[in-house]
Amino acid sequence: MASEGVLLGMGNPLLDISCVVDDAFLEKYGLTLNNAILAEDKHLPMYKELAANPDVEYIAGGATQNTIRIAQWMLGESNATSYFGCVGKDEYGDRMFKLASEGGVNIRYDVDEDLPTGTCGVLVVKGERSLVANLSAANKYKIDHLKKPENWAFVEKAKYIYSAGFFLTVSPESMMTVAKHAAETGKYYMINLAAPFICQFFKDPLMELFPYVDFIFGNESEARAFAQVQGWETEDTKVIAVKLAALPKAGGTHKRVAVITQGTDPTIVAEDGKVTEFPVTPIPKEKLVDTNAAGDSFVGGFLSQLVLGKDIAQCVRAGNYAASVIIQRSGCTFPSKPSFESQ
C-alpha cells in the first residue's frame, strides 16, 4: 500500500484545449509535431480559433499534473499523491481543480488574483501532437506558497518529489528548495527534461539542480538536445543515458537512474554505467488516438510502482502500460480503474 502523500508533484497546471487540426494549421502558426513550446504573441489568436472548433475538448493538463494524476490512478488509494501549482481565479481554474481532484490527488493550488488560468493548445495531426503553452497564472507560482506551513507539511510527508523541467521556467527556487530537502532527508528527487527548449535555454538552472536529481526522465529528442548542449557529440541514446546517470551528485543523494523513452523503440535505463533495454509493445496505428501526455503517463505509471518499492523492470512495465492506455484516448484521460497487475 502507498502511504498518504508519498508522492508530491510541483509544476504548471494548464487546461488543455485539444483539437484535431491539419498540416496547414500547424504551418499557419509555425509549429512542428512532437514538440512543446511556450506561446509567443503570434500564437495567441490560435486559442480563440481552437475554442471556436465544435470538436474542441477541455482536459486537465500540464506535464507534472498529468504525471501525478496517472500515478494516483494507478495507485488507486485516495490522497497517495499531492500537487502544487498556480491557477487563476476563474472558471478554468475551478474546472481544472474539479477534474484533477476527482481521482484522489490532493490539489494545493496557489491562486493568482490577476491572471487567468494557464492553457495549452494541443494540436493533433494523425495522432501526433504539437503543444503550445500559454502559462499565464501558472507562471506566477511563488515560493511563499510552498513555505506556508500547511503546504510544507505535504513536502515533509512526501518520500518522492517530482517536477517536469517546464517548472524551471517558473520557480527554479522552489525546485531547488525541495531538492535540497530531499537530499537532507534521504528522499528521492526526480525531474523530466520535458522539452528540447528546456535543455537549450534553461541550461543554467537545470545544471544547478542536476546534482540533486535521483531519477532523470526524458524522450530521445530531449536526451539528444541535452547531449548537444553539453557538447557530448553523440546521438546514441544509450551513451547519453549512461552520461546523464554519471553526472556529479550532491552528498546525501541516491545513485542517479536515467530513463529514456523512444516511442515504440525500447525504453533505455542507465544506472552505474550499465544500460538495460526494455521493449515496448506497439499499439496498432488504427487504435492510436493521440500521443498527448504519453511521456507524462509513462512517468506516472513508473512512479506508481517506484513508491511501492518495486524494481525498475516493474516500474518500466507500469510506465509502458499507462502510456499505452493514454495514447488510445484523447488527452490525459483514463478509464475509472487500471487493469495493470502488480507483480
UniProtKB/Swiss-Prot annotation:
InterPro entries: Adenokinase, Carboh/pur_kinase_PfkB_CS, PfkB_dom, Ribokinase-like
Function statement: ATP dependent phosphorylation of adenosine and other related nucleoside analogs to monophosphate derivatives. Can also act on the cytokinin isopentenyladenosine to produce isopentenyladenosine monophosphate.
GO molecular function, a single term: ATP binding
Residue positions of the active site: D296
Recorded superkingdom: Eukaryota
ATP-binding keyword on record: yes
Protein name: Adenosine kinase
Pfam families recorded: PfkB (PF00294)
Cofactor: Mg(2+)
Keyword Kinase: yes
Native organism: Physcomitrium patens (Spreading-leaved earth moss)
Enzyme class: transferase
Any one GO CC term of the record: nucleus
